[in-house]
């Protein structure tokens, strides 16, 4: 139950791990994500992990231009126990290839001093670390070695909650077997450092910084004549490009400047809300301003300051911003409880990404002549990865609406393809048509979809969900309350029509419910009826579900 709270998921319901990053389809999307993350924590150094592959150097250059401070090159032989075994043994390339290409590409593009390069994947000795440094790495990641030092026996059952050494399990009986101590890790790292020091001494190098990029100290070992290894040409791997005025080390002075001081959050929101923000208990306050589609991640910086000072404790609508115009990409990303953004206009992609308790309201200007419920007002990938909060959209959303939503509540008047994909929690109400592949990979949460043409079943992915009529009094009450709140927030004519004729529209709604989620909720309810408290009921239901699946 602790893990599920952390992951905003449901006890006993399986998750796809790792979930696909449906907010990244190009280097531009990645650049936007880096910008969003920087806005959400201005003090953070953004680290981007790239898998070693042919062409990774080009991607690394794009990542550096986008403002990342650390690029991690990860190889194929890492020891993760949660990945499929065929991936562990058959997918990927050695970290040496990707590391060398990324390092060389950054030097040739004059970007090497902007970023630190990290390498990982089975760095098991000082020799491995020395080679990584000579190929361009400045930082090094260790996973398998420290785990083995703590007692891991590489059973590769990390995802099954059956770790015999008590390391990767929530089972209290198995956790009693854990014998690891912090001193074991300290000893491992000390011996690793000593091994590295000995190699450096033999090479005549005094510091790790001096070792970075020194491919001239590496020599290709001769392979037996006629062997496959003898046919390999490693010249490119050991190439040491010398570009004028280009460093081979990270320089903090060359870090990318995002210009966050010029954003509306810093110029307007932080100043206008300052008086209320400085109070121990802020008084509700509303401001109005114009926004444009170049104002990316609007509200994110101010939201991060709210989180830093108040956490998620502020009442709804404490800080209310009425925006007129066009919301840029990632409008309202990551905003916390207490912050409400009301947009009179439309918004670009990623609206409400990572919504964390705040409220988003979007509707067209009152004087529009088109049918609001048939026009797109927000772009693709809205509410991606939302964990809490509310969103009311008077209009149609683009594709991949509420992907990996795990706790937010949303009302919208139509969505594109792949709506509610990989959703694990929360509630979504769709007062219009959906695109194809709705609810693919949806393992939690509930969606209510208005099916006026009785053809929704042709567009839903039925692998993990079932369609039911909305009949239970709890569902009817919740649906009606959410539509009412939607109308109050946006003035939606479509929502008002449905409310005024609710008895007529109710039979046309379909409830989308994941199979395992439904089973788990029923088991938890049964345990609570037996007198178990909520937490214990979840634990008992989890093991009941697990035992049933093992039979």
Where are these regions (language model features)?
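Carboxylate/His-rich catalytic cores and anion/metal-binding grooves
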Residues: 1, 45, 53-75, 339, ...
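Short, small-residue-biased leader/transition segments that mark boundaries at the very start
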Residues: 3-5
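Secondary-structure transition/capping motifs at alpha-helix termini
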Residues: 37-45, 65-73, 104-116, 133-143, ...
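Glycine-rich beta-to-alpha transition loops that act as phosphate-gripper elements at the mouths
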Residues: 49-54, 114-127
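Catalytic cores of alpha/beta
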Residues: 55-66, 124-137
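Flexible glycine/proline-rich, aromatic-decorated loop/lid segments
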Residues: 68-79, 89-102, 134-174, 450
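Active-site or pore-adjacent capping/gating segments
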Residues: 140, 144, 151-215, 219, ...
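Long, distal/terminal scaffolding or interaction modules
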Residues: 174-175, 186, 199-203, 212-215, ...
């Amino acid at each position: 139950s602790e893990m599920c709270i952390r992951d905003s998921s449901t006890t006993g319901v399986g998750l796809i791990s790792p979930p696909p990053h449906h907010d990244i389809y190009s280097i531009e999307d990645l650049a936007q994500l880096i910008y969003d993350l920087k806005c959400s924590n201005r003090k953070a150094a953004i680290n981007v992990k790239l898998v070693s592959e042919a062409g990774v150097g080009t991607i690394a250059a794009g990542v550096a231009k986008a403002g990342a401070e650390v690029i991690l090159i990860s190889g194929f032989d890492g020891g993760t126990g949660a990945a499929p075994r065929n991936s562990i043994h058959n997918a990927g390339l050695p970290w040496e290839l990707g590391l060398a290409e990324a390092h060389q590409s950054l030097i040739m593009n004059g970007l090497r001093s902007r970023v630190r390069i990290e390498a990982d994947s089975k760095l098991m000795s000082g020799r491995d670390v020395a080679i990584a440094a000579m190929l361009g790495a400045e930082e090094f990641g260790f996973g398998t070695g420290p785990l083995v030092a703590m007692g891991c026996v590489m059973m590769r059952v990390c995802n099954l909650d059956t770790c015999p050494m008590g390391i990767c399990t929530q089972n209290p009986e198995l956790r009693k077997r854990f014998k690891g101590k912090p001193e074991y890790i300290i000893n491992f790292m000390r011996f690793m450092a000593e091994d590295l020091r000995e190699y450096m001494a033999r090479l005549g190098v005094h510091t790790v910084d001096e070792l970075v990029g020194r491919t001239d100290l590496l020599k290709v070992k001769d392979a037996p004549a006629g062997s496959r290894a003898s046919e390999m040409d490693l010249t490119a791997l050991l190439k040491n490009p010398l570009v004028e005025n280009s460093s081979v080390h990270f320089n903090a002075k060359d870090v990318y400047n995002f210009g966050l001081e010029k954003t509306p959050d810093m110029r307007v929101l932080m100043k206008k809300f300052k008086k209320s923000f400085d109070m121990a208990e802020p008084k509700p306050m509303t401001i109005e301003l114009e926004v444009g589609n170049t104002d990316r991640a609007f509200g994110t910086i101010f939201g991060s300051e709210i989180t830093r000072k108040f956490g998620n404790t502020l009442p709804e609508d404490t800080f209310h911003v009425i925006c007129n115009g066009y919301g840029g990409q990632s409008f309202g990303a990551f905003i916390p409880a207490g912050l409400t953004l009301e947009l009179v206009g439309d918004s670009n992609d990623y609206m409400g990404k990572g919504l964390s308790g705040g409220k988003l309201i979007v509707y067209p200007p009152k004087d529009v002549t088109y049918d609001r419920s048939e026009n797109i007002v927000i772009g693709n990938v809205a509410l991606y990865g939302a964990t809490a909060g509310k969103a009311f959209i008077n209009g149609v959303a683009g594709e991949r609406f509420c992907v990996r939503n795990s706790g937010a509540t949303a009302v919208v008047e139509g969505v594109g393809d792949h709506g509610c994909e990989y959703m694990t929690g929360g509630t979504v109400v769709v007062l219009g048509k959906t695109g194809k592949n709705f609810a693919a990979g949806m393992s939690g949460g509930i969606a209510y979809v208005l099916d006026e043409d009785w053809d929704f079943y042709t567009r839903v992915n039925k692998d993990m969900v079932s369609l039911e009529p909305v009949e239970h009094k709890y569902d009817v009450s919740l649906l009606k309350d959410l539509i009412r709140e939607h109308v109050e927030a946006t003035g939606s004519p479509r929502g008002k029509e449905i409310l005024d004729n609710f008895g007529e529209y109710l039979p046309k709604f379909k409830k989308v419910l994941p199979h395992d989620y439904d089973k788990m909720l029923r088991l938890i309810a049964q345990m609570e009826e037996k007198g178990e408290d909520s937490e214990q009921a979840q634990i008992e239901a989890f093991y009941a579900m697990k035992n049933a699946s093992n039979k």
